[in-house]
Regions:
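Beta-strand-enriched cores of mature, soluble protein domains
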Residues: 1-143
Length: 143
């Protein structure tokens, strides 16, 4: 499987939060983030990512799960799921976790693989993300 790594600056384009009353400082939230990938792998460089993360936080710490969609410059796309741990240490929200490709179309149809990621909130509406992993396209699997 080829290794990949990359980064992107993302803008939070929509977000909603719901305070829970079961215990103090419990919050469920959902956000949509959009950005442009930067990677040394030409298949991923300049692809447009959208992801939707669901946070379950208690006192600013907890979990994030969600879905991602990458639209590549060649018109194909890959998509998948992710999960991570949310930390508010030092007053900056970070999420570290894993992602998994679950499908795609175009040359990305049948993609397998995944990896790890880290996002850091730079403001209320901006994040910086880094990621690393591996993937295999179906045509490489068949060959």
């Amino acid at each position: 499987m080829p290794s990949i790594s990359g980064s992107f600056s993302g803008k939070i384009t929509q977000q909603f939060g719901m305070p829970m009353t079961d215990q103090p400082n419990h919050l469920l939230g959902i956000a949509e983030v959009n950005g442009t990938q930067k990677s040394s792998d030409p298949l991923w460089n300049d692809s447009r990512i959208s992801y939707w993360g669901i946070n379950d936080l208690l006192n600013g710490e907890g979990t994030q799960t969600g879905y991602f969609n990458n639209v590549h410059p060649d018109g194909g796309r890959d998509f998948g799921t992710f999960e991570g741990k949310v930390s508010g240490a030092g007053g900056t929200m970070t999420v570290e976790g894993t992602f998994k490709f679950t499908g795609g179309d175009g040359q990305y149809s049948g993609i397998t693989g995944g990896g790890t990621f880290k996002t850091v909130a730079k403001s209320e509406t901006e994040i910086e993300a880094t990621w690393t992993g591996a993937y295999e396209l179906a045509k490489a699997q068949a060959g």
